[in-house]
Amino acid sequence: MAVVPIRIVGDPVLHTPTQPVPVGDDGSLPADLGKLIADMYDTMDAAHGVGLAANQIGVGLRVFVYDCADDRGLTERRRGVVVNPVLETSEIPETMPDPDTDDEGCLSVPGESFPTGRASWARVTGLDADGNPVSIEGHGLFARMLQHETGHLDGFLYLDRLIGRYARSAKRAVKSHNWGVPGLSWMPGEGPDPFGH
């Protein structure tokens, strides 16, 4: 359908919990949801992302798309959409994240990445694009993506989970880019790729 701008940290839509997608009495989803999902896929693909939440493109609905390997370095990927996701995870470690294995980035924090503590396993249940029940789960990178995208839908960025020196580094990065204010976005496919793809 269309590649659309991705909102940058500081935009209120990223820091506000999303609303559930309305489901009809017959289990049907809104007719215009298909266009939103297509735009989300196009935008995620153009940005070379592994996931994208609706509020990252300015739509406050509880839906995300993904195209993610089960773990780093693997070429086989899983691709899909989850509407009205509910997240379940294993325990999140209370130790400092490892900068070599726990690095995480975000399309709404373009070009930056920071070690982030996440559960090693996660499952999301919800609906697919046709309103059918869906349950997806995984370990490693896939689990990280599930937690990251549902976090967006709850009104949080991964920066909100950072601790210690990583949180301080992220605050400096946001300030140095003049982010943290409403109205900023970037357009995948235009200009240099902030992630170097």
From Swiss-Prot:
Q: Which family does it belong to?
A: Belongs to the polypeptide deformylase family.
- The source's superkingdom equals Bacteria
**Cysteine-cysteine disulfides:** none
Checking Gene3D superfamilies in the record gives: Peptide deformylase
State the name under which the record lists this protein. Answer: Peptide deformylase
Which Pfam families does the protein's record reference? Pep_deformylase
Q: What InterPro entries has UniProt attached to this entry?
A: Peptide_deformylase (IPR023635), Peptide_deformylase_sf (IPR036821)
User: Which gene codes for it?
Assistant: def
Q: Which cofactor does it need?
A: Fe(2+)
Which catalysed reactions does the entry list for this protein? N-terminal N-formyl-L-methionyl-[peptide] + H2O = N-terminal L-methionyl-[peptide] + formate
The top EC class, named as a word, is: hydrolase
Binding-site list for Fe cation: 106, 148, 152
**Keyword Cell division carried by entry:** no
What GO MF annotations does this protein's record show?
Answer: metal ion binding; peptide deformylase activity
